[in-house]
Amino acid sequence: MKIVIIDYDMGNVRSIENAINHIGDYTIIVSGEPDTIRSADCLILPGVGAFPDAMKKLEQQKLIDLLTEEVVVRRKPVLGICLGMQLLFESSEEIQLTKGLGWIPGKVEYMRPGNDLRVPHVGWNSLILKKENSLFDYLQDDKDFYFVHSLWVNCPEKYKLATFEYGIEMTASVQYENIVGMQFHPEKSQRNGLEAIRSFLDWVKIQKLGVSHA
């Protein structure tokens, strides 16, 4: 199975590549080239930095229409990580109101947790699972993942696979059809993070066989 990690100068691509290499024998390509993206079995959209800068980079590399064609029209599985998850939504208020990819209804807002909690939210936090038969079915007692972010995704409940508590309940992971997002960093979340990536890739294999995920 060929996995393409989208390279648009805004992501921690090597850490994600190394994490996947620990999971199994996959063909992993880090690229922003159109033909390579079209040939992928699934895509990973990483992201570190500011939302407006990321959208500008995607636009400059002429990736927005291409990715939309692959993901929305051809229904290629995609995993957005951290900022990459936020880009999947309609807009973000980071720095200035900026239009996102718009693949999932929802908007990205600054965290306002109250209770003297610090922003950015940095460190380990426990997931609250919202759905059965999801990508996180492997989790048992330990549900901790590593987060680094100042904004969160405000979206309808039906798209949420998991949330976390930080003053208020916020979105940790989403899924809409072939589109999956993880606000935490699976590549930095040790065993749980590797298993989250493995679960996503196993789900991709199921999609390739034409079997829907419950």
From Swiss-Prot:
Signal peptide: none annotated. Gene3D superfamilies: 3.40.50.880. Its EC number is 4.3.2.10, 3.5.1.2. The active site is at C82, H185, E187. GO terms for biological process: L-histidine biosynthetic process. It catalyses: 5-[(5-phospho-1-deoxy-D-ribulos-1-ylimino)methylamino]-1-(5-phospho-beta-D-ribosyl)imidazole-4-carboxamide + L-glutamine = D-erythro-1-(imidazol-4-yl)glycerol 3-phosphate + 5-amino-1-(5-phospho-beta-D-ribosyl)imidazole-4-carboxamide + L-glutamate + H(+); L-glutamine + H2O = L-glutamate + NH4(+). PROSITE patterns: GATASE_TYPE_1 (PS51273). SUPFAM superfamilies: Class I glutamine amidotransferase-like (SSF52317). It holds the Pfam family GATase. Its main location: cytoplasm. Keywords: Amino-acid biosynthesis, Cytoplasm, Glutamine amidotransferase, Histidine biosynthesis, Hydrolase, Lyase. One of its GO terms (molecular function) is glutaminase activity. It is found in: Cytoplasm. InterPro entries: Class_I_gatase-like (IPR029062), GATASE (IPR017926), Imidazole-glycPsynth_HisH (IPR010139). Pathway: Amino-acid biosynthesis; L-histidine biosynthesis; L-histidine from 5-phospho-alpha-D-ribose 1-diphosphate: step 5/9. Residues 2-210 form the Glutamine amidotransferase type-1 domain. One of its GO terms (cellular component) is cytoplasm. It comes from the Bacteria. HAMAP family: HisH (MF_00278). Heterodimer of HisH and HisF. IGPS catalyzes the conversion of PRFAR and glutamine to IGP, AICAR and glutamate. The HisH subunit provides the glutamine amidotransferase activity that produces the ammonia necessary to HisF for the synthesis of IGP and AICAR. This is Imidazole glycerol phosphate synthase subunit HisH 2. The gene is hisH2.
